């Protein structure tokens, strides 16, 4: 997004890396004008979107460590690290995005693969965070549900084809599709 928003200029961490990977100065200068800025930023945030890289690999038995060639670390869900919790969630990320880019935002995916009650709680949490940030001045245009009609095999990121159906706001296993608790909660929020 920095590249499209015209922020990758001399001194930006990606500038030298892109130049070393064959991006020409003219190409980067053209992008630096900001003319490729998107009109709206699509913002996806899941409970496990925020990650924590910890060099103390011994604290995470059973978690396979990773490496960048210089450092050994584990990549865990930040939400599982208690001391980070006050800094986590959709609100702080929406605020960061708005403050960094000043481009209108649409929260384009709100979903949590779990019980209906937890899905409603998560949707309400994201909706409330968007409303809070809107009141603080962020231009947040929309909060959308994902997936409206559910997904097949998405929990494996389509790496397996086992026909697992996860219900969305509407359950398509009935005709016509039946609104779920999440759809009803979203309709109530929309009405205010």
Spans of model-derived segments:
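Active-site region of glycoside hydrolase catalytic domains
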Residues: 1-124, 128-192
């Amino acid at each position: 997004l920095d590249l499209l928003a015209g922020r990758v200029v001399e001194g930006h961490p990606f500038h030298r890396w892109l130049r070393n990977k064959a991006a020409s100065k003219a190409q980067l200068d053209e992008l630096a004008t900001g003319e490729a800025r998107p009109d709206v930023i699509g913002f996806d945030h899941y409970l496990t979107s925020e990650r924590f890289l910890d060099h103390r690999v011994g604290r995470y038995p059973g978690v396979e460590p990773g490496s960048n060639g210089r450092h050994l670390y584990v990549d865990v869900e930040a939400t599982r690290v208690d001391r980070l919790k006050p800094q986590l969630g959709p609100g702080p990320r929406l605020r960061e995005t708005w403050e960094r880019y000043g481009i209108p935002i649409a929260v384009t995916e709100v979903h949590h693969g779990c019980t209906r009650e937890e899905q409603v709680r998560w949707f309400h949490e994201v909706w409330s965070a968007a409303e809070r940030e809107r009141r603080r001045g962020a231009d947040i245009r929309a909060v959308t549900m994902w997936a409206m009609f559910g997904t097949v095999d998405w929990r494996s990121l389509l790496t397996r084809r086992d026909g697992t159906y996860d219900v969305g706001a509407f359950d398509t296993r009935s005709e016509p599709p039946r609104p779920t608790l999440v759809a009803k909660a979203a309709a109530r929020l929309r009405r205010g």
